[in-house]
Amino acid sequence: NIIDNFGCEGAGLKLNITQDDVDETIKTFLKDMIPPSILVNNAGVTDDALLLRMKDFQWDRVIDTNLKGAFLVTKSLLRSMLKEKHGRIIFITSVVAELGNFGQGNYSASKAGIEGLSKSLAREVSSRDITVNCVAPGFIETEMTKVLPDDVKLRMAENIPMKKFGKPEDVANAVRFLASEQAGYITGTVLNVNGGMAMP
């Protein structure tokens, strides 16, 4: 329905990005389609706990989805981009990749790992007109943050120089820019969308 609403041609694919058969599934799906030239890695989960209380499965679930999943999908779609000598790869990371966050050792590690993966890949493929960048959101107004008590949201906003949460459109605009031809000479960078929470 989303594709039809925008008057575009395309199709959707639902898959578990943590499984090793991702490559074969994507190949089969794209067999009769024009290979995509833009990849946005935005799948992610959280499973919070203090490190001493964190179970192995909590660590593995977050790392497998957020980091390994991004690796598997990127590797699968990279071949066609290299063949076409053009592509845009964008990873969604987080402000916690730089700042860390209480009870989110697994999530912070996965997002920091993505930033390292992105910069390494940028060095490998940028000579083929494939750019690789990250967008790192801070606190964004989502269904998850809407349920927080107002006093909690106010305290969180106090730590943001702009004194407010971002909107999903702020993240989407950053992704749209990095996917565009206007960003053709930008690679290996992290575009912070966090209202000034983290200033490298």
Q: What residue spans do the PLM features occupy?
A:
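Short, small/polar-rich loop/turn modules that mediate ligand/substrate recognition or access, typified
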Residues: 126, 131, 186-188, 194
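Short-chain dehydrogenase/reductase
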Residues: 1-36, 47, 57-58
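Active-site loop-to-helix junction immediately N-terminal to the catalytic Tyr of the SDR YXXXK motif
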Residues: 54, 100-108, 120, 148
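Active-site helix of classical SDR
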Residues: 74, 110, 118
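Alpha-helical segment proximal to the catalytic Tyr-Lys
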Residues: 79, 123-127, 184
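Residue(s) in the substrate-gating loop at a strand-loop-helix junction
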Residues: 94
